[in-house]
């Protein structure tokens, strides 16, 4: 399994070349979100090295010339669980002039090393699906010991010091659709550069909300300058280097 895949067509980031710092046949994550397209996996908050820096360097050589707008750390689990994430980010930024992003569930922002590593990125897309502990537990099903209050405080502290583009992704399903107003209030405190309103259109265990429902939710975020919706955003055409690597991450195919 290669640590690099794509490019894939991202409604948020454009043509995205993926780097998977976990690179596991089975999902490894600090959450077990009810809407995850990867299904159940290994739930942990322990950071470790999954992919060596040398392997990443070799895999990057195989995709030279891949047409992409951005390089994104995302894949078969929570990317911040990779203990050598900082070294990976540093290497990618030395070999490419493309902006470098991450899709994170925000669970490890309180970790000093994670905070430092993510500060080097051009774009951080942080997950926030809940306004309170009960909804947090119901949707994200976090690893034991991850408490909502600390989770939210970690996002706030990171946002205060981060100078790149900070996007807040909110996945709406039946469980949290009536909490959009409360989540908008939290977003006002966090002051993201962008709000991404999502619902699970990929095959998973829960049904997506309709376009009309998402439009109603968007109204709560009308005060924000930059709000994207999964139903409205355009997706560019892409040609993955290796379609099988895309399939392993259960990403949509072109």
Which residues does each predicted region cover?
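Auxiliary Fe-S-binding modules of radical SAM enzymes
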Residues: 1-12, 176-254
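Canonical Radical SAM [4Fe-4S] cluster-binding loop centered on the CxxxCxxC motif
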Residues: 12-53
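Short, conserved beta-strand segments within well-ordered enzyme catalytic domains
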Residues: 18-20, 37, 70-74, 101-103
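Short, basic/glycine-rich phosphate-binding loops at helix/coil junctions
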Residues: 35-41, 67-70, 130-135, 165
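Conserved alpha-helical substructure of the radical SAM core
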Residues: 39-73
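Flexible, glycine- and charge-enriched loops at secondary-structure boundaries
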Residues: 46-53, 144-148, 207-214
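Alpha-helical elements of Rossmann-like donor-binding domains used by nucleotide-donor carbohydrate transfer enzymes
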Residues: 55-58, 87, 182, 216
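Conserved AdoMet/S-adenosylmethionine-binding subsite of the radical SAM
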Residues: 80-209
């Amino acid at each position: 399994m290669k640590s690099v895949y794509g490019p894939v067509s991202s409604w948020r980031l454009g043509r995205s070349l993926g780097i998977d710092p976990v690179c596991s046949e089975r999902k490894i994550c600090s959450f077990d979100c009810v809407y995850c397209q990867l299904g159940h996996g290994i739930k942990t908050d322990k950071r470790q090295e999954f992919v060596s820096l040398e392997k990443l360097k070799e895999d990057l050589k195989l995709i030279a010339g891949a047409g992409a707008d951005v390089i994104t750390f995302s894949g078969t689990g929570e990317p911040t669980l990779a203990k050598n994430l900082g070294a990976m980010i540093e290497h990618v930024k030395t070999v490419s002039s493309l902006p470098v992003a991450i899709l994170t569930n925000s669970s490890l922002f309180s970790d000093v090393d994670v905070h430092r590593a993510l500060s080097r990125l051009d774009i951080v897309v942080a997950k926030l699906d809940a306004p309170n502990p009960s909804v947090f537990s119901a949707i994200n099903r976090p690893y034991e010991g991850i408490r909502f209050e600390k989770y939210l405080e970690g996002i706030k502290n990171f946002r205060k010091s981060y100078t790149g583009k900070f996007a807040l992704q909110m996945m709406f399903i039946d469980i949290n659709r009536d909490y959009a107003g409360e989540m908008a209030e939290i977003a006002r405190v966090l002051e993201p550069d962008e709000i991404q309103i999502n619902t699970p259109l990929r095959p998973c265990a829960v049904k997506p909300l309709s376009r009309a429902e998402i439009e109603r939710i968007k109204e709560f975020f009308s005060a924000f300058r930059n709000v994207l919706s999964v139903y409205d955003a355009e997706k560019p055409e892409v040609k993955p280097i290796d379609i099988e690597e895309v399939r392993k991450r259960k990403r949509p195919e072109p």
